[in-house]
UniProtKB/Swiss-Prot annotation:
It comes from Bacillus subtilis (strain 168). This is GTP cyclohydrolase FolE2. Its EC number is 3.5.4.16. InterPro entries: GTP_cyclohydrolase_FolE2 (IPR022838), GTP_cyclohydrolase_FolE2/MptA (IPR003801). Converts GTP to 7,8-dihydroneopterin triphosphate. GO terms for molecular function: GTP cyclohydrolase activity; GTP cyclohydrolase I activity. Pfam families: GCHY-1 (PF02649). Induction: Repressed by zinc, via zur. Pathway: Cofactor biosynthesis; 7,8-dihydroneopterin triphosphate biosynthesis; 7,8-dihydroneopterin triphosphate from GTP: step 1/1. The record marks 183 as: May be catalytically important.
Length: 304
């Protein structure tokens, strides 16, 4: 028969492993009596443009032009404000406090509601500017091309709003989506077949201050990325579907340079986009390296 040692009580175990009783200190425990270092005013030599909290995980509700029309996803927030040189620090707890208030009030994340949130953030912090950046996975239903077998895909979305007192909001939208690319050179020189691979398209689009946004910015950016690739990805494919996807890719060969330029053309035609950056990266199936292209364009500065 096994012999069992009788364990000491929980408090005794904790003390056994090093826990000690709290000491009675001399510093105040009431908030009103505590020294507030952040509010000490004097010259600290430099203004700070962005100070706040980053990597804040929080659930958000979003809407989508593609099914599911409404979904809750896990977002990552960066919330910052400016700090003049005569202030030592900010009250950072107010940033996450406001996020919790919006969450409790059933916040649906959109550029309109993010504008309101960012402006209120600046007012709560008593500063002249604030920036909120949000990243989250967006899920959408996709059917296979022939048998229409449905499954969920996702792309990573980026939203950013900057508020400056007495100035228009500065807004930016972004997406990182996966696509299929088939090599034109491989197709041209080979007797049969061509190497293809999965690629990543990342887009960042500056939103024109006077533009009316579409019903779903996410869908516009996804279309720009996928419709210019060799083929789209699918969560579920049966043999007839796989044949269709493979042949579609063969009919639409794309260098990484081609993909960047074609996406740029689509973004150029979107009235709500004032400037954009595009990154295309192919995980080459016949190389150990990636093929890479980056394209930047501003409608106000650059010419075609």
């Amino acid at each position: 028969m096994n012999q069992h040692t009788l364990l000491p009580k929980k408090t005794e175990r904790l003390q056994y492993f090093g826990s000690v009783s709290p000491i009675k200190g001399e510093k105040p425990v009431e908030k009103e009596k505590m020294k507030d270092l952040q509010n000490i005013r004097k010259d600290y030599f430099f203004d700070i443009q962005h100070v706040g909290v980053a990597n804040v995980s929080h659930p958000v509700t979003i809407t989508s032009a593609m099914m599911p029309a409404e979904q809750t996803t896990a977002a990552n927030f960066t919330m910052t404000c400016n700090l003049p040189r005569n202030q030592k620090g900010i009250n950072m707890s107010r940033l996450t406090e406001l996020l919790q208030v919006y969450h409790q009030n059933g916040w649906i994340l959109s550029f309109s509601s993010l504008q309101q949130f960012t402006k209120e953030l600046a007012e709560n912090m008593d500063t002249s500017s604030a920036t909120v950046e949000v990243r989250f996975p967006w899920f959408f239903e996709r059917k296979s091309p022939k048998l229409e077998k449905a499954g969920l895909m996702h792309a990573d979305i980026f939203m950013s709003v900057t508020y400056r007192k007495d100035q228009p909001f500065k807004q930016r939208a972004g997406i990182s989506a996966k696509v299929t690319t088939l090599c034109p050179c491989s197709k041209e020189i080979s007797e049969y077949s061509a190497h293809n691979q999965r690629g990543t398209v990342s887009i960042w689009a500056d939103i024109h201050p006077a533009a009316s946004l579409p019903s779903d910015v996410k869908a516009d950016l996804l279309h720009a990325a996928e419709s210019n690739a060799s083929a789209r990805l699918h969560p579920v494919l049966k043999r007839p579907d796989e044949k269709a996807v493979t042949e579609t890719a063969y009919e639409n060969p794309r260098f990484v340079e081609d993909l960047a330029r074609l996406i740029a053309a689509d973004l150029f035609e979107l009235e709500w986009v004032s400037a954009f950056e595009i990154e295309c990266r192919n995980e080459e199936s016949i190389h150990l390296h990636d093929a890479y292209a980056k394209l930047c364009f501003s409608k106000e500065v650059d010419k075609i």
